[in-house]
């Protein structure tokens, strides 16, 4: 693995597949022409041998020529096998993706290469634009010990004044449109279910995290019908930014290069997912995102530039810091970019976007508006799960539950959830879902029950506290990273712990490395908590408190769709497919199972 991302950074890690199962084929166009047109095309299907020439290049030697035609064997140069991000999306060989492919195809080297090629082009220069996530801003602000506002000014200065980007925007506009569509879809589902009497047993599962979605596609396809098809902020922002930039500059969308800075490496894979709802004429097949970098990769780019690019100059111009932040945001955005005042804002709820929280609050607002409920009659109840990465939120009206959602972070917790959603489990069914009871837990509960009976204590007074059960809620916000997106794999890690000399010589068998690991884990948890505080310092804009603005967002998006001939499905919807398991015996033998 690369120095940027390694398994040592992860505490909730599932090993990738041992072998890539994508078939290696030699395209016909790359074969020697004199054999492509032959009557038997035996060079394609006949007996061949691979040899290395004097230059170290691999050659395919046809043995059939010497056996049948008694001629000198023909040779064909072989090209290196290449794997694209699209291949990773359609391959079940790894749990999410091959990290080398992510770094190779969406790296700062590729960005710099594109910038150099554009500068050398004559009349075909590209316009470079960037979008920046809230988690990235918090990570960099923490790493450089700055406020969010100061970091935003420096980021815009880096991209616009040093790297020559035309526009820089926050991803908040895309996120708010994603939140609105996700919440409205949930509210419609809930109201429609009541109308037709449908028993909504299984929850809707979020699709914002590409790592979780790929895991479901490759290992648990039975949950795909439950996964929401609403796009993430990254993809919605990309569609908006490319169309608006192309229109303003009078160029085609293919001439706009969109870089987005995200907290997670798997966001690179999300950008490679093909569009299902693109226009049939092919004009809309331009990707919404051309390159995804993480905080770590951005810092690496700056370090390797040898002073050409500086995020934090040695002497920061005071004129830059004194600028009004609202004016800085406005000057960096396209002139036709809407809601500039909200485009760098944050949203209440989790550090992954607040999807679970926003759904409950917008549903509450819906009930107040349509059912004449009083706001003071609502309350929110939070139930903790078996660990801090699982919790449930219940919206109560006069003490009665009217809606619920949950947060599930980390692959261990995700595995527990999808097991409960697996059809056909009949052991100890509760609410239509199979729950396996640990025998040791059952015996312990039995002993506790006997103890309560003998002591005369009432069952109600000794009842255990409720534990969150995400399998029974309306909506689950799922993130592959423990602690959510604020702890994404591409975020700046905590500084390495400084070891102090021990008071006494340690025994020869002492496992000092284990101690260092424990210290690192504690430091990382504290570090992530500090980054979360930075994240929460981003000015909040609660959609549920501004229903009139929600109407404005919806109206603007509808006008955008008409003006740019972009369908609602193209702007807001994505798709998922079951990834078929390999049938090749070798791949099955060396592959991994999860």
Swiss-Prot record:
One of its GO terms (molecular function) is metal ion binding. Keywords: 4Fe-4S, Iron, Iron-sulfur, Metal-binding. SUPFAM superfamilies: Fe-only hydrogenase. Signal peptide: none annotated. Residues 444-465, 492-511 are annotated as: Disordered. The keyword Nucleotide-binding does not apply. Pfam families: Fe_hyd_lg_C. GO terms for biological process: iron-sulfur cluster assembly. [4Fe-4S] cluster 1 binds at residues 20, 88, 91, 94. [4Fe-4S] cluster 2 binds at residues 209, 264, 481, 485. PANTHER family: NITRATE, FORMATE, IRON DEHYDROGENASE. Belongs to the NARF family. Component of the cytosolic Fe/S protein assembly machinery. Required for maturation of extramitochondrial Fe/S proteins. May play a role in the transfer of pre-assembled Fe/S clusters to target apoproteins. This is Cytosolic Fe-S cluster assembly factor NAR1. It comes from Lodderomyces elongisporus (strain ATCC 11503 / CBS 2605 / JCM 1781 / NBRC 1676 / NRRL YB-4239). The lineage of its organism: Eukaryota, Fungi, Dikarya, Ascomycota, Saccharomycotina.
